[in-house]
Amino acid sequence: MLQLCKVQAVSVKEAHAKIKDDPAEWTKARKEFEAAGLRIVSVGKIDFALDTDEDVDRNFKYAQALGAAGIVMAPQLAVLPRIERFVKQYNVKAFIHCHGPEDKVFPTPDSVLKAVQGMDARMGLCLDSGHTIRAGVDLIAAMRQAGPRMLDFHIKDLRDLKDRNTSCQVGDGAVPVSTIFKTLKNMSYTGDVNLEYEVLADNPLPGMLGSFAYMRGALAGITV
């Protein structure tokens, strides 16, 4: 399916490789992705539920074994100093995913930026277009404010910018997709943009193809 979408990079979730599995299974999963021509760029979302060296270390070993340069995470504030220590040890980035108004810890990009202020530059933000807009935040302004702390980007489209249940094919909704890509280019953004297509789970391919086609068209149309 991903090959039909002509993508070369992927963010891996536990559905693809489980953290609790033997590390040999992680290596096996990585080889399977690589054999399919896919490079694993990140893993997660990981919650870092236990504030212990053993648990945090295993999550970083998992990311490293899969060849991921970063971890998408949704931790509690108290765990961040420990995570930062392992970021330095493994040279693996860790970016907090803001989840909108339902998230009691990190609802907005600004809440993430405040949490990682003063920390290692590899501690940052995974900005989600849909959740950010639903939180009542100016998406483009938030991107610019985050600057180099924005290490990862999840893109989705919504027909109703206040309703998470109106997710749709990218380009069919109200999220300013073209402006997003223009802003990323103007910022000289070097991270990944991951499509989150959460529609028609039984037959997602047509919508994925349409989403990638729209995004590639938006990129091609950028002149500055």
Each predicted region: which residue ranges?
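Catalytic domains of carbohydrate-active enzymes, especially glycoside hydrolases
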Residues: M1-A15, L66-G67
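Histidine-acidic metal/acid-base catalytic patches
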Residues: M1-K6, F106-L127, H131-V224
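Active-site acidic/histidine proton-transfer and metal-coordination neighborhood
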Residues: A9, E32-L127, I133-G136, Q145, ...
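Glycine-rich, proline-tolerant flexible connector loops at the mouths of alpha/beta enzymes
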Residues: A9-R30
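Conserved residues at the C-terminal ends of beta-strands
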Residues: K13, G44-I46, A74, K156, ...
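Short, acidic/turn-prone active-site loops that include or flank metal/cofactor-
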Residues: A15-H16, G100-P101, I155-D157
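Stable alpha-helical elements in mature extracytoplasmic
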Residues: A29, N59, V79, I83, ...
